[in-house]
Every structure is written in C-alpha cells, then in structure tokens.
UniProtKB/Swiss-Prot annotation:
Intramolecular interaction between the zinc finger domain and the CAP-Gly domains may inhibit interaction with tubulin. Residues 97-101 are annotated as: Important for tubulin binding. Keywords: Cell projection, Coiled coil, Cytoplasm, Cytoplasmic vesicle, Cytoskeleton, Membrane, Metal-binding, Microtubule, Phosphoprotein, Repeat, Transport, Zinc, Zinc-finger. Residues 129-188, 302-340, 987-1006, 1298-1319, 1395-1414 are annotated as: Disordered. InterPro entries: CAP-Gly_dom_sf, CAP-Gly_domain, CLIP1_ZNF. Binds to the plus end of microtubules and regulates the dynamics of the microtubule cytoskeleton. Promotes microtubule growth and microtubule bundling. Links cytoplasmic vesicles to microtubules and thereby plays an important role in intracellular vesicle trafficking. Plays a role macropinocytosis and endosome trafficking. Residues 993-1006 have a biased composition (Basic and acidic residues). Detected in dendritic cells (at protein level). Highly expressed in the Reed-Sternberg cells of Hodgkin disease. It comes from Homo sapiens (Human). It is found in: Cytoplasm; Cytoplasm, Cytoskeleton; Cytoplasmic vesicle membrane; Cell projection, Ruffle. A zinc finger (CCHC-type) spans 1417-1434. This is CAP-Gly domain-containing linker protein 1. GO terms for biological process: cytoplasmic microtubule organization; microtubule bundle formation; mitotic cell cycle; positive regulation of microtubule polymerization.
Length: 1438
C-alpha cells in the first residue's frame, strides 16, 4: 500500500474501563510522564499505520458496527475527494445515515437515501460495544487525563512509567487497551491522591450520567472546570446536553443559544457539552481530624482506583504492596522510632516508663485493628472467590451445552446443504433433459413446416382429397407448438427453482460460516478461561485461623437469611401477578363478547348482501333472455339472407334494410340495458361488493356465447363465400349482384368485429377493476390483521408496564426502608470504636455485592426480555413473508392466465395467416390467368371508361364505410367514457368504505378507552364495596333470618290452607255422592241440573286452590334461588376477606423479620462491645509479649501478600463477568443478523413482486398491440377481397373483348396496340399494389411473431429491431432511459433522478468576515478549520 496522510486520529487511552476484558501485559514499557505531550504530537504519524491495518482487516461486504451501535455492511474502502486519508463507506440497516453513497457530487457506492455513511476505519467494530466504549471515550488522549487538579502529582512523580502511543491497535482485538502503570504514592501527596481517587470514581459514563445534578462541580473535556447549570434536551441538537458555567471566560455563550435561554451567566462563561464529556469533581476533606481518622480509607480508595486502571498482575501486586506500606508506616516504623528516641531521652524515672508503656499499648491497639481489618478482607475474598468459582462452574456447564447445541445445529445445516446440493444436481439434470426435448420438438416443427410447404404445392394440383390431409397436418403442427410452449414454461420454472435453491444454499453457507466463527471464538474464550483458572488457583489457605472460619460461617448464615427473604418476596409477587392475570382474563372475555356482537352484525349485513345479489341475478337473467332472443332473430335473418341469394335483387335489398333496422334496434336496446345496469351498479356498488363477482362471471358466460355465435356466423359466411366462388365459375353473369351482397356482408362482419372489440374492452376493464378490488380486499384484511396484532401487543405492553411499575414501587419502598435502617445503623456505628468501623466496612462491602447481584439480575431480565422481543419480531417477519409469498402466488397465477390468453390469440393469428396464404395463392392464380388472357387479347377504350367509373363508385363506397367506422369509433369512445365514470365512482365508493372503516376503528378505540376508564372506576368501586361489605354482611344476615322466618310462616300458612282445602274437597265429594244418590232416587231433571251446577262450582274452586298452590311453590323456589345467590356472594366475600388477611399476615411477617434483623444487629453490637472489653484485658498480657510481636508482623506481611493475591483474583473474576456480559451481547448481535437476513429476504420478495407486476403491464400492452394488429389484418383482408373482385371483373371484360374482337374484325391494328398498352399499364399498376400489400402482410407477420416471442420469453428489447431487413448485420440499439420513480422514458435514469437527491450537490460557499490578525481555530483530529481539538466531536462522520 501507498503511504497515507496522517489523519489526526487520537491515540487510544491508557485508562481501562471496568467493563473491559483482561489483556496482555507489555514486557518493558517505561516512559516518563513529561514526554506525554511529545508522544501525543507524534501520534499523527503512526495513526496512518493503524488505518492501513484497519483497511487490511476489513473487506467490502463485511458486517460492521459504526461507533459500536449502528449496524451495516461495508460497500467502499479507500481514499475520497472530500477529505484525505482512508475512509469506509457503510450501508446502514436503518435510515439514520447522511447520504445515499455520494458526497459533494461524487458517487462512491449506491444505496437508499439516508442509509449511507462515511467514517474512518478505526471507528468500525465487528461486534456491538458497550455504552461507555460506543460513546467515544475509547480514544481520549493522555493530555485530557491530566487535569489541573493532579498537576502536583504529575510533577512530583516524574519517574512513573507510561506506555508509548506508537503501538497500533488492531480491530480484531477491540477490547485491547494498553495498561498504564500507577505512580507510587507517598505520605507527602495525600491531597493529590484524594483528587486522583475522586476523579477515578467518575470514570464510567453511566455513573457520571446518574450522579450529575444541577450545582455539581464538573470538568468539561478534562481541562475546563465549572458548575452545572442546565441538564436536558435542547433545540439546537439532539440528545442530552449539560450547560456549564465555567470558572474562567473560556466558554462560547452566556447560557443562551439560537435565541433560546437555558440558564443565566456572564458572557464567555457559558458552555454546552454532551453528558458523556462531562466528569464530576469530588473535594477532599480539609479538617485534620477526619484526615487522621480516615487514613486507611484513603489508601484503600487510591489502591482500588489504581487497580481499576492497571490490569496486569505485576502492577496490582505493586499497588497492594504500596498501599500496605502506606498504611503501616505511620503505625509501625514511625512509632518505633519515636519510642526509641523517648527511651534515649527519658531513661531515668518512672514517668518515662509509664509513657513508654502507654505508647506501646497504643501501638498494640493499632496492630490489632489492622489484623482484624485484614481478617475481614480475607474472609470477604474467600467467600467471593467461592461464589465466583460456583458461577464459573455453572458458566462452563452452560457453555459446554451451548457448544454441543451449536455442533448439532452445524450438523443439521450440513445435511441441509448436502440435500440442497443433491436437489440442485437433479434439477440441472432435469433442465438438460427438458432442453433436449425442446430441441427435438423444434427440429420436428421445422420438418413439419418443410413437409407443409411440399403439401401445399401438391394441394394446388389435387384439391379435395388432400385438403383433409393438410388440415390434419396443421392440427399436428398446432399440437407440437403447444407442446413446445409447455416445455418452454417447464424450463422457465426449473430455472427459477434453480435460482431459488442457489440463493438458499448461499444463505445457508453464510450462516454456517458465521456459526463456525462463533464456535471458534467460544472455544478460544473457553481455553483462555481454563488457563486463567489454572494459573489463578489459590495456593491453599493453610495459615487461616479458626476466627476467620467462624466469621465466614456467620456471613454465610446472613446470606442464607437474605436469600430466604428474597424468595418470600418473589412468591408474594407471583401471587400478586396471578391475581392481576385473572382480572386481565376477565377483561379479555368482555372484549370477546363485544367481538361476537360485531360478528353477528356482520352476518346480518351478509344476509342483506345475498338478498341484493339475488335481485341482481334476476335482472341478469332477464337481460340474458333478451340477448338470446336477439341472437335467435339474428340467426333467422342470416338464414333468410342465404335463401334470398337465389331470389331477385329487390327482395334481397329489402331484407338487408330490415336486417339493418333490426340490428340498430338491437344495438339501441343493448345500449339502454347496459346504461340501466351501469346505473344500478353505481347505486349499489358501495353496499354490495360481492355482487360484482357474480355479475362478472355471468357476463363472461354471455360474452363467450356471443363469441361462439359470431364464430358460427363467420363459418357460415365462409361457406357462403365458397359457394359464391363455385357459382362464379359456373355463372359469370350474376357476378355484379353477388359483389354487392358480399360487400354488405363485409360491412356486417366489420360491425360484428367492432362489437367484439367493444366487448373485449369491457372485459379487460372489468378484469382491471376486479384486480383492484381484490388488491383492496387483501390490503384491508392485512391492515385489520395488523391492527388486531397491534392491539394485542399494546395490551400485553400495558400489562407488562403496569407490572413493572408495581415492582418498581415495591422496590422503592423496600429500598427506602433499607436506607433508613442503614442510616440508623451508621449513626450507632459512628459512636462505637475501631471495631465498629470494621463492621461498617463489612456492611458496605455486603451492600456493594448485593447491588452487583441486583444489577446482574436486572441485566439478565433485560436480556431475556430482548430475546423475547426479538423472537416476536422474527415471528412477525415470518408472517409477513408468508403474506408476500401468497401475493407472489396470486400474481404468478394471473401471469399464467395472461400467457394462456396470448397463446389463444397467437393460434387465432396463425389461422388468419393460413387463410391469407390461401387467398394469396388464389390471387396469384387469378393474376396468372389475367396475364395469359391479356397476352391473347386486347381491349377497347370504352371498357376502360367503364372500369374507371366502377372504381370511382367503389371509392365512394369505401368513403361511406369509413364514415360508418368513425361513427362506430365515437360510440366506442362514449362507452369508454362511461366505463371510466364507473371506475371513478367505484373508487369513490371504495374511499368512502375506507373512511367508514377508519371511523369504525376510531369508535372501537374510543370504546376501548371508555372500557379502560370503566375498569378503573370498577376497581375504585371494588375498593369501596370492600369497605361496605363488612357493613352489608351483618345487615344481610339479619335480613336473611327475617326472610327465613317469614318464609317459614308463609309455608305453615299455606300448609294449613292446603289441609283445609283438602278437607273441603273431601266434604264436597261426600255431598256430591249424596246428591247423586238423591238424583238417582228422584230421577228428576231439575235436581240433576242443580247438581251439575254445584259440581262445576266445586271444580272451579278446586282449580283455583291448585293454582294458588303452584304460585306458592314458585315463590318458594324463587326465594330459595335468592338464598343460594346470597350464600354464594357471602362465600366470595369471605374468600376476599381471607385473601386480604393473608396479605396482612405476610406484611406483618416482613415487619417482624425486619425487627428480628435489627435485634440481631443490636446483639452483634453487644457482642462486639464484650469482645472489646476482652481485648482490653488481653492488651495487658500483650504488653509482656512485645518480643513475640515481631514474628506476628512477619505473619501479617504474609497475610497482606495473600490478600493482594485474592484481590487480583477478584479483579480477574470481575473481568470474566464482563466477558460473559459481552457474550450475551454477541448473541444479541447474532439474533439481529438473523433479523436483517429475513428483512433482506423480504426485500427480495418485494423486488420479485415488482418484476412480476412490470411483466403483467408489458403483457397487457402487448395484448393491446396484438388487437390493433388484428384490426389491421382484417382491413388488409377486406382490401384483398376487393382486389379479387376487381380481378374477376377484368376477366369478364376480357371475355367480352374477345367476343367483340371475333365479331368486329374491321378494327385497325393501331387501336388494338394502344388498348393493349393501356391494359398492360393497368395490370402493372395492380401488380405493384398487390406486391405492396404482400410486403405489408409480411411485415405484420414479422411483428406478430416478434410480439409473441417477446411475450413468451419476457424480453421486450427485441421489438426495437423488427423494422430492419438485415437484422444480423445491424448492432442492437441502446436501451431507452427509464425512471422508476417518475414513470417516464428518455428523460433520466432512476439513479440520476432529482427527487432522489436529498442533499445539495454543490457545497455552499463559505464566507469568513474575521480579522486577518486573529488565529483561526484549527482541529488536528478532523484536519478542518472552525473549532479547536478540545471542542471536537469524536463521533464525527461524513
């Protein structure tokens, strides 16, 4: 590669993020801090080398991420005109770019608008980066890290090592960053270490964004200090911005930008910067007491900050040793020297001994405190290491399972690819066989055409018996041609399937490659993890004491307690969610009932539509009967015409006149009926969309019947013409009369053809409207389905959001409780001694661990939610694919129908061509006969004048026919206008229907909102009802008792009444019997009648009592039902009360658990105080054992070393956790890749659909041109018939001339010569006309053949060369320019369309009005004027 210009890219930072992975440590990296500025200046030259390495690694077509968050594919790599150096052009997946592949009028690649972007290769990554890396902190220079606050430390620690910036950074290792060694910390630089620790705490962007508040002290760009005055979004740029009031006039404004004020300050003191460029400053404590008390904390803070920066094990051990030395110096060496000096001064006297004893006791207390601190840290480290080892084991198992699954998937994909390859080979074999068959068929067709020519020559000699053979051969040829077409379509289908299989194999191979890459990466990561595990195994804590083990066990018990608490909370939350889900299911059931109502309404509308369809079918049946009667009358008229051929001229003319009047009447009736039907369709189309389908089907049947009748008429006409030819040979005298009849028949045929054309136009327009209606129905269905899916998704989202809100509220409540408890504990712990401080540190560590656990759980939940959303999007894309495939199948079926229609048209054209050939042969025979006759005889001038008169008469007839043609065309145009009006009305009705649909949709949405409001009100009412329930229960109980008592009373009363009625019935029956006996005895009519009346009264009374009994039974049943319902309600209320009581008990249990924890903490504090007293007692004993303390110091140092090792292991485990998080991100990226692949497949399907639509439009145009050619052929046929008639007239005139010559022999030879010359000239003229007509016929045949071949092969470019006689010599013409956006030819191409250009081609002229003496701001990063390097946006792209 050629040497590149220095791009001014920043050197990578030496600060390591907490989320980054562990890297290789350099062997020898030593450079003073004073040389950082020179290394920064020198970084411009090696940056070109890094760019070369980036360009070498990346390739065109590779999948990358711009700044770690914008996915796309590389389409360009190299130098550009708009800026020096190497640039990469990327096509993004989403329209969030800046161009369409062209910048400043120069095109580097082609893509959709706002999807193209140009960046430096160093900004590209092959994986999705974390947020802090993607925001641009990856490439901040070392000069920014050295703030004004830490200049003192930089000056004092001049010998601290720093890595050189010349080492390039490859993109294949995106997480690789250079470690920076931390300077040694001395006792003199406490304030500097405090400021450095404060700055290091604000290292991560996320923390900075969370902690920034208005009024905070911050640094902008690492150099400008100030106070935050504004936080939020602005009008001048997108994203979150921070408005800072600087300490010095180094800003750009006074708090206002572009006329809008965000805060108030002095001019040049205001500055706006993105949030990720602003870092918070912490202030060190100034009081000496606090500094002495928190010396250990400061040292720990500095060591942790330095550990975060340096990943290497050597730097970590050195920092831990430095920290231990710093913490131990004031306690051991300093005090020892002081005691020795005091012993030297005050040897004599008891006071000196007492002071020495006090100092030693203080020294022992400090040593004990440090020992306790170290023990606590070791315990924490061991517990943390155990947990991380368990997590590592789980991660290893998961990784092994994932690897096995990936291998299984790989095997499946390989089998799939092999099967696809086999299918491909089989399809290729089939293609070759089909091609062979096609070639054989073409050879057969050529042979048949040769034999056809021979047979036609023979048919001139023998007429009748061989005509049948020729017809059979023609039929064979047609069958062969049809089979050829079938084989061609088969071949086309096979080719398409081959292309589809190729695309599928390519996509599967790319998937396999990606999976193999992922496998290799995973295997490497596993190997690295194993190596680290083997290298970082603990050496075995042999010297750990029993006290440490006891503390570990106590901590484990606390952890178990917290876990049980968490599990209880989770179970309570699950129960809460279950209740919520039940309520949601009830709401869904209510919605289902509403949908059922709507479906019933739809069914009623459908029944109305069916009724309307029946009415329309009756109208069509009437119209059909009328058409049939008209066709029958037309056929009768044709038969009468045939009969009238044998009769005289007068009767024929009258019949023709009658026929014409009848036809005109028929046309008028037909037009009136069509107008009536159109009016009906206009009025009913909006309400009855399905009527059109039935009408169209029946119309098609009618048209087919008409076409059949027309074909029958044509066949009859052909037979009549044959008869006329026979009669011409027999009787030459009746030729003139027959010519007139034939002309009239031709006029009728022309009119029939016009009618057929009009009908064809109608059918084509009806088909177009049908297709539009189908498309509209499909779109409506798709929109309704999409809307329903959207509603479902919205409901699910709302439910999920509600659940999340409830969880957040509960979390906040618990966190507030926990914070209040921790505050109380801290207040108590401040009063305790150094041991209580150790306890507080333990609790802080525990809290940090819990926070980390919560963060990890939240990340895991987010990842699972994202995976679910990705799966949903995948399912949606699959559904869309299925819909597209269905549309594709519909269009392909339409294409096949159109091709079948073309084939039918071509068959008709071929039949007409055969007829033309027969006529041409007959014409040639006649011409030969005329030539022979003209040679033999002469003609007179009188005959010539007669000929001219006849010609004039025929020309007049032609003019009259042309006038009739124009009238017919006007009628056709009128019909077309009426059809257009119909289409406009149909579109209006469709628009109205769409509007109605939208209104209904809005009403449904309103109803939904009303239902939601009702649900809220119902919830409130439920709460009120719960309050009222307790009152209502007591009231209902009392009412129940009263009602039961009343019912019992009524039952007793009714039973008494029943008994009385029964007794009365029995008494009455006895009386009846007595009366009957008396009636028998008396046998009188009056007494019998009286008895009958009494019987009737008794029966009436009995029926009344029975009815009252039934009424009482019904009332009893009703009351029992009411009792049952009240009991059920009572049970429900009791259940709800029990649930509320259970919730109260759960909350009480939580409160008791919190109280128990507080009590345990109090007990722990008491135990610690007891331990303190015990330790004070032990201090006296330890004073005697000062000699042994030195050995303990050495053991203490060993413990410190072990602690440093454990700290290193902790850091490495954190790094591994970050690696696992990155693995999850990579899995997300792979899912996004699969989504992009599906979207690409969708775009391909859309492109195929557009191609098919274009082919359909081309075929329709070709159909129209074929119809126009058909009309031209018919006019030529009519001209041919006229010429044949002229030839026959000439033959008759020749015969008459011969007779006259035989009679008049006295004419002179000179006149005969002149007549012969005149006749010869006429014959030459006629011959030239015939030759011209033949040429026209040949040209038209060529055009028709070209059109048919183009329609079959799908190539429209061959039609440009049909006019050329020598096609082989001429070169093909260039294709015409066509714009798909504007739909116009010859203006411009789609790539050069002005509507596509969204940005101005020429950049605007820059005018600068500054003074020449001022220094213009220049950025070394962008290599542009207008701003300084400190104000540069790192994420700048083109």
């Amino acid at each position: 590669m050629s040497m590149l210009k220095p791009s001014g890219l920043k050197a990578p930072t030496k600060i390591l993020k907490p989320g980054s992975t562990a890297l290789k440590t350099p062997t020898a990296v030593v450079a003073p801090v004073e040389k950082t500025i020179s290394s920064e200046k020198a970084s411009s030259t090696p940056s070109s080398e890094t760019q070369e390495e980036f360009v070498d690694d990346f390739r065109v077509g590779e999948r990358v991420w711009v700044n770690g968050n914008k996915p796309g594919f590389i389409q360009f790599l190299g130098e550009t005109q708009f800026a020096p150096g190497q640039w990469a052009g990327i096509v993004l997946d989403e329209p969030i770019g800046k161009n369409d592949g062209s910048v400043a009028g120069v095109r580097y690649f082609q893509c959709e608008p706002l999807k193209g972007i140009f960046t430096r290769p160093s900004k590209l990554t092959r994986k999705v980066q974390a947020e802090d890396e993607a925001n641009g902190l990856q490439t901040t220079p070392a000069s920014r890290a050295t703030s004004p606050l830490c200049t003192s430390t930089a000056s004092m620690v001049s010998s601290s090592p720093s890595t050189p910036s010349n080492i390039p950074q490859k993109p294949s290792q995106p997480a690789a960053k250079e470690p920076s060694a931390t300077p040694p910390i001395s006792n003199l630089t406490k304030t500097a270490s405090e400021s450095i620790s404060n700055l290091s705490e604000a290292g991560s962007i996320k923390k900075g964004e969370r902690e920034l508040k208005i009024g905070d002290r911050v640094l902008v760009g690492g150099t400008k200090a100030g106070v935050v005055r504004f936080l939020g979004e602005t009008d001048f740029a997108k994203g979150e911005w921070c408005g800072v009031e600087l300490d010095e006039p180094l800003g750009k404004n006074d708090g206002a930008v572009a006329g809008t004020r965000y805060f108030q300050c002095q001019p040049k003191y205001g500055l706006f910067a993105p949030v990720h460029k602003v870092t918070k400053i912490g202030f060190p404590s100034t009081t000496p007491a606090k500094a002495k008390a928190n010396a250990v904390r400061r040292v720990m803070a500095t060591t942790s900050a330095s550990l975060k920066r340096s990943p290497s094990a050597s730097s970590l051990s050195s920092m831990s040793s430095v920290a231990s030395s710093v913490s131990s110096r004031p306690s051991r060496t300093g005090l020892l020297t002081e005691t020795s000096s005091r012993y030297a001064r005050k040897i004599s006297g008891t006071t000196a001994l007492q002071e020495a004893l006090k100092e030693k006791q203080q020294h022992i207390e400090q040593l004990l405190a440090e020992r306790d601190l170290e023990r606590a840290e070791v315990a924490k480290a061991t517990s943390h290491v155990g947990e991380i080892e368990q997590e590592l084991a789980l991660a290893r198992d998961g990784h092994d399972q994932h690897v096995l699954e990936l291998e299984a998937k790989m095997d499946q994909l390989r089998t799939m690819v092999e099967a696809a390859d086999r299918e491909k080979v089989e399809l290729l074999n089939q293609l070759e066989e089909e091609k062979r068959k096609v070639e054989d068929l073409q050879f057969r067709v050529e042979e048949e055409s040769i034999t056809k020519g021979d047979l036609e020559q023979k048919s001139q000699i023998s007429e009748d018996p061989e005509n049948t053979q020729t017809k059979l051969e023609h039929a064979r040829i047609k069958e062969l041609e049809q089979s050829l077409l079938f084989e061609k379509t088969k071949a086309d289908k096979l080719q398409r399937e081959l292309e589809d299989t190729r695309v599928a194999t390519v996509s599967e191979k790319s998937r396999i490659m990606e999976l193999e890459k992922d496998l290799a990466l995973r295997v490497q990561e596993v190997a690295e993890l194993r190596r680290r595990l083997e290298s970082n195994k603990p050496a075995g804590d042999v010297d750990m004491s029993l006290s440490l083990l006891q503390e570990i066990s106590s901590l484990q018990e606390k952890l178990e307690v917290t876990r049980t608490d968490h599990q209880r909370e989770i179970t309570s939350l699950k129960e809460h969610f279950g209740a919520r889900e039940e309520t949601h299911q009830k709401e869904i059931k209510a919605l289902y009932t509403a949908t059922e109502k709507l479906s019933k309404e739809n069914e009623s509308l459908k029944s109305k539509l069916e009724h309307a369809n029946k009415e329309n079918s009756d109208v069509i049946a009437l119209w059909k009967s009328k058409l049939e009667t008209a066709i029958a009358s037309h056929q009768q008229a044709m038969e009468e015409l045939k009969v009238s051929f044998s009769k005289g001229l007068g009767t024929e003319t009258a019949e023709f006149a009658e026929l014409k009047t009848q036809i005109e009447k028929m046309r008028l009736d037909y037009q009136h009926e069509i107008e009536n039907l159109q009016n009906q369709q206009d009025s009913e189309r909006a309400a009855h969309a399905k009527e059109m389908e039935a009408l169209r089907a029946k119309l098609m049947k009618v048209i087919k019947e008409k076409e059949n009748s027309l074909e029958a008429i044509r066949s009859k006409l052909d037979k009549a013409e044959d008869q006329h030819l026979v009669e011409m040979e027999d009787t030459l005298n009746k030729l003139q009369e027959a010519e007139i009849k034939v002309k009239e028949l031709e006029v009728l045929q022309a009119k029939c053809n016009e009618q057929t054309k009009v009908i064809d136009n109608f059918t084509s327009q009806l088909k177009a409207t049908e297709e539009k209606l189908l498309d509209l129905d499909a779109l409506r269905k798709a929109s309704s389905e999409g809307k329903s899916e959207m509603k479902k998704l919205r409901q699910q989202l709302e439910a999920a959001e509600k659940q999340i809100k409830h969880l957040e509220i509960e979390k906040n409540a618990e966190s507030s409780k926990a914070s209040s408890i921790t505050r109380e504990l801290q207040g108590r712990e401040l009063k305790l001694t150094n041991l209580q401080e150790n306890l507080s540190e333990v609790s802080q560590v525990k809290e940090t661990l819990e926070k980390e656990l919560q963060i990890l759980k939240e990340k895991f939940a987010e990842a699972s939610e994202e995976a679910v959303s990705v799966q949903r999007s995948m399912q949606e894309t699959v559904n869309k694919l299925h819909q597209k495939e269905e549309q594709f199948n519909m269009l392909s079926s339409d294409l096949e129908k159109l091709r079948e229609n073309l084939a039918d048209m071509e068959a008709k054209f071929r039949e007409k061509d055969e007829r033309e050939e027969q006529l041409i042969k007959a014409k040639e025979k006649l011409e030969n006969d005329i030539a022979e006759i003209m040679k033999m005889s002469g003609d007179n001038s009188s005959q010539l004048t007669k000929m001219n008169d006849e010609l004039r008469l025929k020309e007049r007839d032609v003019e009259e026919l042309q006038l009739k043609l124009t009238k017919a065309n006007e009628n056709a145009s009128f019909l077309q206008k009426s059809i257009e009006d119909m289409t406009v009305k149909a579109e209006q009705s469709q628009q109205e229907a769409a509007k109605k649909h939208e209104e209904e949709k809005k009403e449904l949405e309103r109803k939904l909102s009303d239902l939601e409001k009702k649900m809220e009100t119902s919830h409130n009412q439920c709460q009120e009802l719960k309050a009222r329930y307790e009152r209502a229960t007591s009231e209902t109980k009392t009412k129940h008792e009263e009602i039961l008592q009343n019912l019992q009373k009524t039952l007793l009363d009714t039973e008494d009444k029943l008994k009385g009625a029964r007794e009365e019935n029995s008494g009455l029956l006895q009386e009846l019997e007595e009366l009957r006996k008396q009636a028998d005895k008396a046998k009188a009519a009056q007494t019998a009648e009286d008895a009958m009346q009494i019987m009737e009264q008794m029966t009436k009374e009995k029926t009344e009592t029975l009815a009252s009994l039934e009424d009482t039974k019904q009332t009893n049943a009703k009351l029992q039902n009411e009792l049952d319902t009240l009991k059920e309600n009572n049970l429900k209320n009791v259940e709800e009360l029990n649930k509320s009581k259970e919730l109260l008990t759960v909350e009480n249990q939580k409160m008791e658990e919190f109280r128990k924890e507080i009590e345990t903490l109090k007990q722990a504090a008491a135990q610690k105080s007891q331990q303190l007293s015990a330790l004070q007692e032990e201090n006296v004993k330890l004073a005697e054992e000062l000699g042994r303390s030195r050995d303990e110091v050495t053991s203490h140092q060993k413990l410190e070393e072990e602690r440093s090792v454990l700290n290193n292991q902790l850091l490495e485990m954190k790094k591994r956790e970050s690696k696992f998080i990155k693995d999850a991100d990579e899995e997300k990226a792979s899912l996004q890749k699969s989504i992009s692949i599906t979207s690409a497949l969708l775009t391909e399907k859309d492109a195929e659909l557009e191609k098919l639509r274009n082919e359909v439009t081309v075929l329709r145009g070709e159909n129209a041109s074929a119809k126009s050619l058909h009309s031209v052929v018919q006019t030529l046929e009519s001209d041919k018939v006229k010429l044949e008639l002229k030839v026959k007239n000439l033959e008759l005139q020749l015969k008459e001339n011969k007779r006259q010559l035989s009679s008049s022999s006295g004419n002179t030879d000179t006149q005969a010569d002149e007549d012969e010359r005149a006749q010869e000239s006429q014959i030459d003229f006629l011959n030239s006309v015939i030759v011209d007509l033949q040429r026209k016929n040949q040209d038209l045949k060529m055009k028709v053949e070209m059109m048919s071949e183009a329609a079959l092969n799908g190539n429209g470019d061959d039609l440009n060369n049909y006019d050329s006689d020598d096609q082989e010599k001429q070169s093909k013409k260039k294709p015409r320019l066509f714009c798909d956006i504007c739909d116009c030819f010859d203006l411009h191409d789609t790539e050069d369309c002005p509507t596509q250009a969204q940005m101005s081609e020429d950049p605007p002229h820059s005018t600068h009005h500054g003074s020449r003496g001022e220094e213009r701001p220049y950025c070394e990063i962008c290599e542009m004027f207008g701003h300084w390097a400190t104000n540069c946006n790192d994420d700048e792209t083109f």
